[in-house]
């Protein structure tokens, strides 16, 4: 399946496919299947890039969840009780690590948003987050329109944003609704119920259904979006995922011995909460979605939908759209004029010209 067969906008219907070309009768083996081996060798040599953002109030286990996802000490959280003051403004911090498993390299960038929703007045607290996402689109666009550009443009665009919903047991808060409405138009959003072990199974399911109703009522289109299902297999798989979103998750980065085997989990006086046990939480569904089944699809939608929408708007604003065959104006706008569709000013900073391979 060609991952690039997506319409440039979710509002546009797919074009009817042209009549298929009849297969040519072959007289013998040619070796076409070797192309797959070539792609695999090249992919393992180049490695993969994946950029994830975690958003939510302090104390919801964002850092622990990232460490649990990748089974590494990707992010170190500040332990409670050290007198660390709450940030007065929203800050964004990014860390990049290279994770290797069975010869496959993954360049992982995690962006945390400490201070989100922690203030008494949270008006426009989403502006720095949306501005950061659009700034990464702008950096990629400025590299893309250069006459002489790098063979491999470093991709810092946010491929997925995991939004942590507090386990209140009621419904989405006005802050959640307002932020998700803005965020889902710019990036792939996967909401999760944080610290789900604080809810009973009945409370968890009722909370999930109320959140799903909130998402439908306020037209919040979270990932995986229904309009991007490419075939019947996608529809079957994604419909099951959509029915379970938001996933009720528990994070833990310590191993415990249970029935003679080591498991990741949280130890309580009632027992061990196993994060990879579906009877305890839905962390395996989140892990499979982000890594095992939909990682490349998250990157494809980011490039072909969200970034493409941003690129078209920016080129229209800057009058850089081609006016005829072969015509293109490559002069970028001045930094003070680089505005996103939401009038957030982006000043392009220094770029890390890292090598293609890592």
UniProtKB/Swiss-Prot annotation:
Region annotation (G1 motif) ranges: 56-63
Binding site for GTP: 56-63, 89, 115, 195-203, 251, 266
Region named G4 motif: 194-197
CDD domains in the record: CDC_Septin (cd01850)
One GO CC term, this protein: sperm annulus
Glycosyltransferase as UniProt keyword: no
GO biological process: cell differentiation; cytoskeleton-dependent cytokinesis; protein localization; spermatogenesis
Annotated spans, G3 motif: 112-115
GO molecular function, one term: GTP binding
Disordered: annotated segments: 1-25
Disease: Spermatogenic failure 10: An infertility disorder caused by spermatogenesis defects. It results in decreased sperm motility, concentration, and multiple sperm structural defects. The most prominent feature is a defective sperm annulus, a ring structure that demarcates the midpiece and the principal piece of the sperm tail.
Family, similarity comment: Belongs to the TRAFAC class TrmE-Era-EngA-EngB-Septin-like GTPase superfamily. Septin GTPase family.
Name of this chain's protein: Septin-12
Organism: Homo sapiens
Biological classification of the source: Eukaryota, Metazoa, Chordata, Craniata, Vertebrata
Gene: SEPTIN12
């Amino acid at each position: 399946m060609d991952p690039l067969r997506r319409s440039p906008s979710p509002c546009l219907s797919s074009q009817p496919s042209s009549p298929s070309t009849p297969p040519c009768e072959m007289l013998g083996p040619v070796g076409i299947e070797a192309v797959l081996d070539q792609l695999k060798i090249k992919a393992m040599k180049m490695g993969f890039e994946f950029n994830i953002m975690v958003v939510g109030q302090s104390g919801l286990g964002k850092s622990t969840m990232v460490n649990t996802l990748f089974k590494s000490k990707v992010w170190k959280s500040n332990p409670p009780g050290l007198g660390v003051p709450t940030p007065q403004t929203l800050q964004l911090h990014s860390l990049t690590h290279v994770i290797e498993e069975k010869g496959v390299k993954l360049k992982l960038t995690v962006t945390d948003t400490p201070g989100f929703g922690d203030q008494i007045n949270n008006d426009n607290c989403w502006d720095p987050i949306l501005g950061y996402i659009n700034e990464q689109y702008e950096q990629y666009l400025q590299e893309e329109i250069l006459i002489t550009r790098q063979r491999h443009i470093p991709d810092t665009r946010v491929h997925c944003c995991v939004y942590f919903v507090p386990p209140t047991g009621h419904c989405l808060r006005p802050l959640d609704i307002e932020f998700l409405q803005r965020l889902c138009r710019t990036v792939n959003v996967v909401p999760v119920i944080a610290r789900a072990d604080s809810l009973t199974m009945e409370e968890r399911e009722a909370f999930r259904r109320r959140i799903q109703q909130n998402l439908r009522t306020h037209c919040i289109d979270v990932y995986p979006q229904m309009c991007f299902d490419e075939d019947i297999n996608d529809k079957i798989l994604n419909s099951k995922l959509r029915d379970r979103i938001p996933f009720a998750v528990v994070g833990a980065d310590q191993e415990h011995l249970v029935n003679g085997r080591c498991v990741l989990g949280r130890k309580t006086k009632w027992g061990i909460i196993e994060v990879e046990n579906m009877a305890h939480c839905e962390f395996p569904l989140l892990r499979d979605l982000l890594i095992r089944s939909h990682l490349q699809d998250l990157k494809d939608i980011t490039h072909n939908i969200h970034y493409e929408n941003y690129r078209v708007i920016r080129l229209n604003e800057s009058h850089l759209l081609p006016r005829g065959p072969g015509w293109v104006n490559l002069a970028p706008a001045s930094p003070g004029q680089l505005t996103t569709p939401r009038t957030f000013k982006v000043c392009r900073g220094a770029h890390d010209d890292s090598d293609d391979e890592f």
